[in-house]
Amino acid sequence: MAEEIKNVPEQEVPKVATEESSAEVTDRGLFDFLGKKKDETKPEETPIASEFEQKVHISEPEPEVKHESLLEKLHRSDSSSSSSSEEEGSDGEKRKKKKEKKKPTTEVEVKEEEKKGFMEKLKEKLPGHKKPEDGSAVAAAPVVVPPPVEEAHPVEKKGILEKIKEKLPGYHPKTTVEEEKKDKE
């Protein structure tokens, strides 16, 4: 009995000789799923295909009912392919088209600006380099300038730097006495 219990598989699988070399087999990996697939033809497919060559109609063929949709009606009514002034309506009766009256368009004359070169466009954007316009269009009544009103005490204009200095802690602006001394010098 000891001889029967040896590592013998229950079913012996006969080895099939393959046409591939042993190098190809080792390159495919452990499960051999990347190998070349052989063209297999299933014998089951041919009889099945021959059975279904004829189509069987179980129900009676229904006569085709033509349903007109709203879109089709609109498309047909808008078509202007016919040269006649009559057109079939949705009822099947002929009706005359209304003639479209075109309103006369009023043409507005647009003044074309003078074609300007690159330098003229740049000069126009810069201050002080404006081209003098027509003198006749600008001739207007002289503007009356009211005399400037003098204030009791003149307001000092502060620069940006002075405004920033005032906001700094510990900054004490000059008194009026110190400013008068500088003005005298």
Curated annotation (Swiss-Prot):
- The UniProt entry annotates sequence repeats at 112-132, 154-174
Q: Name one GO biological process term.
A: response to cold
- Stretch list, region 2 X 21 AA repeats, Lys-rich: 112-174
UniProt keywords, alphabetically: Acetylation, Chaperone, Phosphoprotein, Repeat, Stress response
Specify the superkingdom.
Eukaryota
Task: Give any GO molecular function from the UniProt entry.
Answer: lipid binding
One GO CC annotation: plasma membrane
Q: Which InterPro entries does the entry link to?
A: Dehydrin, Dehydrin_CS
Annotated protein name in UniProt: Dehydrin ERD14
Please spell out the taxonomic lineage of the organism that makes this protein. Answer: Eukaryota, Viridiplantae, Streptophyta, Embryophyta, Tracheophyta
